[in-house]
Design a protein with these regions (language model features):
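Acidic, metal-coordinating catalytic segment for phosphate/diphosphate chemistry
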Residues: 1-35, 39-41
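A residue-level structural signature of the nucleotidyltransferase/glycosyltransferase Rossmann-like core
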Residues: 5, 44-45, 131-132
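Short loop segments at secondary-structure junctions
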Residues: 11, 40-43, 51, 113-118, ...
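A short, polar/proline- and glycine-enriched secondary-structure boundary/capping micro-motif
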Residues: 26-28, 56-61, 132
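A glycine-rich, hydrophobic loop/mini-helix early in the fold
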Residues: 33-64
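Unchanged
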Residues: 66-151
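Charged phosphate-binding loop/patch that engages nucleotide di/tri-phosphates or the phosphate backbone
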Residues: 148-171
Length: 171
């Protein structure tokens, strides 16, 4: 089944055009990718491991992905989190941490406080094959061992101080 994404301009305005997933982006066209750091309030971050068949095989990451055509950023992150972990969250529960842009993509980085037992996580076949709650020090060890997807490692290092502050606050 073909999947389409909305096309944005560099200033994040919708253009009204659609992009077929898996095809090259044209100059001046941008998609939207969303990511979420799920934290438990006890100093841990939820990570999932990519299956061997995917790029960055066997590395750990946070949940996220591309927004589908017609989705808002919040709709996309709620869908991605549920698809990849089985965790349901209302759009109002997500907190926007940061936004970014590269050559063809706008990024929205969210966080969500949720203390979900690992046994309740439902992994998405073909996407992820393991899950863990990782402390900040463990995440740093995984980064040093190159066991966290490099893009995700960069995100974590940029957003670490904010994530640490959030761990110390009550809902």
């Amino acid at each position: 089944m073909e999947e389409f994404n909305d096309v944005y301009d560099k200033d994040r305005n919708l253009t009204g055009r659609l992009h077929l997933r898996g095809t090259p982006w044209k100059p001046g066209e941008y998609g939207l990718v969303v990511c979420v750091w799920v934290y438990d309030g006890k100093g841990n971050i939820l990570l999932t491991r990519r299956v061997p068949e995917k790029s960055f095989a066997g590395t750990w990451e946070n949940s996220g992905g591309a927004a589908k055509a017609g989705e808002t950023s919040l709709q996309a992150i709620a869908r991605e989190l549920f698809e990849e972990t089985g965790i349901r969250a209302g759009e109002e529960e997500f907190q926007l941490l940061d936004r970014g842009r590269d050559s063809f993509t706008h990024y929205d980085y969210y966080c969500l406080k949720r203390d979900t037992p690992l046994g309740d996580i439902v992994l998405l076949p073909g996407e992820t094959d393991d899950v863990q709650w990782a402390s900040f020090s463990k995440i740093h060890r995984l980064i040093a061992q190159k066991k966290i997807c490099r893009v995700i490692a960069g995100q974590f290092l940029r957003q670490e101080q904010t994530l640490r502050r959030l761990q110390d606050t009550k809902p």
